[in-house]
């Protein structure tokens, strides 16, 4: 044995040829700080090993290396000096691999991402098996490769290909990597180690010039000035169009490659180190790393629920066809759970099947679904007018009109049809699950299952626990949501649950400005272009449906009569009364139509200004617009955490990211609060407290700020 550590071992695989194998104790290999130390120690041992002729780098697991240990990042990045030292030292460990006095071959199976890909790039040769996926996804964390990726990849596959890989963060299958020269061969999994060893032997025997293969990675980039300039200019345009100003990582990746292009290895690595460090101190990086960690926490919690499930969902029933019902039935059938779609009208059933067919047709056009699979999925949806058709299903998702009396009646009726062990759920967006359960004989078998529209695209499903909902029911429904490919987040019952409860104070803040005569178009521009929402509040209201939003204000007022009191003179109420329902009937805040080419159009309507009494072009300072929209949202999500509606700040952040499209570079409402600083937020909110209760922070937040605590410390949020 040449070296034995906790995560790495090195030994001769046969005389003269050593295998450096990653074998972490966990389920995957990753470069945490301890593993990087071991990597350096192992390479030092190899450097000093006599009679060494070649080295292959492998993994004992079904995947190679998934990258750095992201759980260490936020703590590490909070110390600037430590961060600078860490990235400089860590990147030089990969130089040790590249500088070994013998040929090196990386053997990749499964995922080789981030640092895993960078370890491969430090090898002279790379062999992948057919399961391999290789990539540098750091931009998705607001970062760039930090272990030499921006220096080595352009020298291996060319600057144009490297820029595409690095600035998009895309994963690449083995054969695609082979086409651009990122790997030298692709073999079947059972032949991987043998192929890597044979290549090392061939290089050691002089049949391959491994020194010539290594040399370009040590020198300035081999591209003439004109070629390089054209590549960089093209990349700058693409990055500006795709990443925009809110995501600095792709811009920094380009900067690192440009600054290092004419440098030898050390100079190019220094350029990368500097760019990497700069990004670690940005709000976007803190937010995007926070999202990753929150997503992992949410997934881990969901898996625990699902693991505890005693009932497996094999068949589903959907009550109410239409757009939502059709979408739910489609998603269930797509993921292998046959669905019975029941409605009282044939027209609605036809619409539901049409919705499923429309989604599948787009999949066929894009090459994601073949005709055979399309037919199979559609045949897994059974449209019916008969209640008895759902009597044997394992779960029913009610998706009828958002009316408590109608829902209550439908749920009670279907409960009498399904088996005693079947689970009943409601796809309500605001109505109390506890109240709906009062009509049921088995309330413990009932919960909310709130999908978001369009169902096939939106990842979030809120699982709402009523007062009498059993743990077994929640566990089974979470497992079903996971089977559907969704991200379930369990919340406790209250009007609006989590997402809509938090949304309506935000819309109320917006409406307050419109009531003062401020141009809604200007507000939308600020919230989209500067804050980063995919849609401003006026446009969002039109997409949700003005009538739907207006109806929800009635429900929210019933639950929170002072804080969310409905105002008949508000913009939403006025538009609803004028039957301007938004996109669904072509007119809301905006008017909707199509241009000569059939593309959808959205324009401000003079009639809207007249109806609402607001003035075209009247603006507020952008900071005030953001404050008046966002303070109510943050205050409400804090209340939800303090009242135990949602279990953690991480879950709340992910719910708003996945359910509302909260700007990822801001990380969610709690990460946004953390970035602003709680003291600063309180000071800002107090400035607007005279506008109403939605602007007034909780006593709990004041206590948290005084104690210097964070809502990400879950023990402090209860």
Curated annotation (Swiss-Prot):
SUPFAM superfamilies: 6-phosphogluconate dehydrogenase C-terminal domain-like, ClpP/crotonase, NAD(P)-binding Rossmann-fold domains. Residues 310-718 are annotated as: 3-hydroxyacyl-CoA dehydrogenase. Pathway: Lipid metabolism; fatty acid beta-oxidation. One of its GO terms (cellular component) is fatty acid beta-oxidation multienzyme complex. InterPro entries: 3-OHacyl-CoA_DH_CS (IPR006180), 3-OHacyl-CoA_DH_NAD-bd (IPR006176), 3HC_DH_C (IPR006108), 6-PGluconate_DH-like_C_sf (IPR008927), ClpP/crotonase-like_dom_sf (IPR029045), Enoyl-CoA_hyd/isom_CS (IPR018376), Enoyl-CoA_hydra/iso (IPR001753), FA_oxidation_alpha_subunit (IPR050136). GO terms for biological process: fatty acid beta-oxidation. Gene3D superfamilies: 1.10.1040.50, 2-enoyl-CoA Hydratase, Chain A, domain 1 (3.90.226.10), NAD(P)-binding Rossmann-like Domain (3.40.50.720). Disulfide bonds: none annotated. One of its GO terms (molecular function) is 3-hydroxybutyryl-CoA epimerase activity. Keywords: Fatty acid metabolism, Isomerase, Lipid degradation, Lipid metabolism, Lyase, Multifunctional enzyme, NAD, Oxidoreductase. The active site is at 450 (for 3-hydroxyacyl-coa dehydrogenase activity). Substrate binds at residues 295, 500, 658. NAD(+) binds at residues 324, 343, 400-402, 407, 429, 453. The keyword Chaperone does not apply. PROSITE patterns: 3HCDH (PS00067), ENOYL_COA_HYDRATASE (PS00166). It comes from the Bacteria. Heterotetramer of two alpha chains (FadB) and two beta chains (FadA). Involved in the aerobic and anaerobic degradation of long-chain fatty acids via beta-oxidation cycle. Catalyzes the formation of 3-oxoacyl-CoA from enoyl-CoA via L-3-hydroxyacyl-CoA. It can also use D-3-hydroxyacyl-CoA and cis-3-enoyl-CoA as substrate. In the N-terminal section; belongs to the enoyl-CoA hydratase/isomerase family. This is Fatty acid oxidation complex subunit alpha. It comes from Idiomarina loihiensis (strain ATCC BAA-735 / DSM 15497 / L2-TR).
């Amino acid at each position: 044995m040449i070296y034995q550590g906790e995560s790495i071992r090195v030994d001769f695989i046969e005389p003269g040829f050593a295998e450096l194998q990653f074998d972490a104790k966990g389920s995957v290999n990753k470069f945490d700080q301890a593993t990087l130390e071991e990597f350096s120690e192992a390479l030092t041992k190899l450097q000093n090993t006599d009679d060494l002729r070649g080295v292959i780098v492998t993994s004992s697991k079904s995947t190679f290396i998934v990258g750095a240990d992201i759980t260490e990042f936020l703590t590490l990045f909070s110390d600037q000096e430590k961060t600078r030292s860490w990235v400089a030292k860590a990147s030089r460990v990969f130089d040790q691999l590249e500088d070994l006095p013998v040929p090196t071959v990386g053997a990749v199976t499964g995922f080789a991402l981030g640092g895993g890909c960078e370890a491969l790039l430090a090898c002279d040769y790379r062999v992948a098996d057919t399961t391999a996926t290789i990539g540098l996804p750091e931009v998705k964390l607001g970062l760039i490769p930090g272990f030499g990726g921006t220096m080595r990849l352009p020298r291996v596959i060319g600057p144009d290909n490297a820029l595409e890989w690095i600035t998009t963060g895309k994963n690449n299958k083995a054969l695609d990597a082979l086409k651009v020269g990122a790997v030298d061969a692709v073999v079947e999994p059972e032949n991987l180690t043998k192929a890597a060893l044979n290549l090392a032997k061939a290089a050691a025997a002089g049949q391959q010039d491994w020194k010539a293969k290594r040399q370009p990675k040590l020198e300035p980039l081999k591209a003439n000035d004109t070629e390089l300039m054209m590549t960089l200019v093209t990349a700058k345009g693409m990055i500006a169009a795709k990443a925009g100003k809110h995501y600095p990582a792709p811009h920094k990746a380009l900067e690192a490659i440009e600054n290092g292009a004419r440098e030898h290895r050390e100079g190019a690595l220094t350029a990368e180190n500097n760019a990497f460090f700069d990004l670690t101190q940005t709000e976007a990086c803190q937010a995007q790393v926070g999202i990753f960690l929150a997503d992992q926490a949410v997934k881990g919690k969901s898996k625990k629920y699902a693991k505890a499930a005693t009932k497996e969902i094999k068949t589903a029933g959907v009550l109410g066809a239409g757009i939502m019902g059709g979408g739910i039935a489609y998603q269930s059938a797509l993921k292998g759970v046959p669905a019975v779609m029941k409605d009282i009208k044939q027209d609605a059933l036809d619409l539901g099947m049409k919705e499923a067919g429309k989604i599948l047709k787009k999949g066929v056009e894009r090459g994601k679904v073949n005709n055979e699979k399309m037919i199979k999925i559609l045949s897994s949806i059974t449209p019916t007018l008969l209640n008895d058709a759902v009597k044997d299903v394992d779960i029913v998702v009610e998706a009828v009109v958002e009316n408590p009396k109608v829902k209550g009646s439908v749920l009670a009726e279907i409960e009498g049809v399904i088996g005693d062990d079947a689970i009943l759920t409601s796809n309500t967006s605001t109505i109390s699950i506890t109240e709906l359960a009062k009509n049921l004989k088995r309330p413990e078998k009932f919960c909310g299952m709130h999908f978001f529209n369009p169902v096939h695209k939106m990842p979030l499903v809120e699982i709402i626990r009523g007062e009498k909902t059993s743990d077994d029911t929640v566990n089974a429904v979470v497992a079903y949501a996971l089977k559907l490919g969704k991200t379930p987040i369990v919340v406790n019952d209250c009007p609006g649950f989590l997402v809509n409860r938090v949304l309506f104070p935000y819309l109320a803040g917006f409406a307050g400005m419109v009531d003062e005569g401020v141009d809604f178009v200007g507000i939308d521009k600020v919230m989209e272009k500067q804050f980063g929402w995919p849609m401003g509040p006026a446009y969002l209201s039109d997409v949700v449906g003005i009538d739907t939003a207006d109806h929800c204000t009635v429900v929210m007022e019933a639950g929170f009569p002072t804080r969310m009191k409905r105002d008949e003179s508000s913009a939403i109420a006025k538009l609803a009364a004028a039957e301007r329902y938004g996109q669904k009937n072509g007119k809301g805040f905006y008017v909707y139509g199509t241009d000569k080419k059939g593309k959808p159009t959205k324009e401000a309507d003079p009639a809207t200004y007249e109806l609402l009494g607001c003035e075209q072009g009247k603006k507020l300072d952008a900071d005030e617009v953001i404050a008046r929209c966002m303070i109510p949202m943050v205050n409400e999500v804090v209340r939800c955490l303090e009242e135990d509606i949602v279990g953690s700040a991480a879950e709340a952040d992910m719910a708003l990211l996945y359910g509302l499209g909260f700007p990822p570079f801001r990380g969610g409402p709690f990460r946004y609060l953390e970035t602003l600083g709680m003291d600063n937020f309180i000071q800002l909110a107090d400035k607007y407290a005279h506008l109403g209760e939605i602007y007034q922070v909780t006593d709990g937040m004041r206590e948290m700020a005084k104690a210097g605590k964070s809502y990400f410390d879950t023990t402090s949020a209860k």
